[in-house]
Amino acid sequence: KGALAEARHVYIDSALRASGKKEINVLEIGFGTGLNTFLTFLESQEKGLRINYTTFELYPLSPDITEKLNYPALIAPSSESIFALLHQCEWNQKIAISPLFTLYKRHADSLEGIYDVVYFDAFAPEKQPEMWDEKIFREIFSHLSPGGILSTYCAKGEIRRRLQSVGFTVEGFPGPPN
């Protein structure tokens, strides 16, 4: 449940809800387990938000791994089929998951479009240093709408300075409530 609480806090509460918009273009760097996508889908249905969700993943998890993930059982057992669908959707095609939620899983590393919210969910800088490069942040910043939000777990000073150097205003937040 720790990963679930952190994902809700960092991405849903601190970014998606903080955007204050009813129609939101979301970019996720790192689809991974699909947890952030699933939480965003559920939020869109509950709050009536129209979400255009683009996610990048160069190394998708295999079906034998994703089928074992139990997030729906912990969050919304009636949504198990939606969670499975998020993983089974074709890559590089926009798919309407519901009238309010469109998913575009990209198996690429170049950005297109303008985003209101960015979930930067790459592995830690020590594990995946190439993802935390100033060049990547500059590219993301150039695709962010005015007043757009980038949210990440990383609180390292070095990463904060890189974000600021390309134009981001950086704010720190306390961790998730216990």
Segments the model singles out, each with a brief description of its role:
Residues 65-113:
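S-adenosyl-L-methionine
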Residues 1-29, 33-45, 128:
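Class I S-adenosylmethionine
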Residues 116-131:
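A short SAM/SAH-binding and catalytic strip from SAM-dependent methyltransferases
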Residues 117-119, 146-154:
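Conserved beta-strand signature within the Rossmann-like core of class I S-adenosyl-L-methionine
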Residues 156-178:
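Class I S-adenosyl-L-methionine
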Residues 130-147:
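A short glycine-rich, Lys/Arg-flanked "PGG" loop and its adjoining helix->strand segment in the class I
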Residues 54-60:
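Conserved acidic E/D residue at the C-terminus of a beta-strand in Rossmann-like folds
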Residues 42-52, 73-74:
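Conserved S-adenosyl-L-methionine
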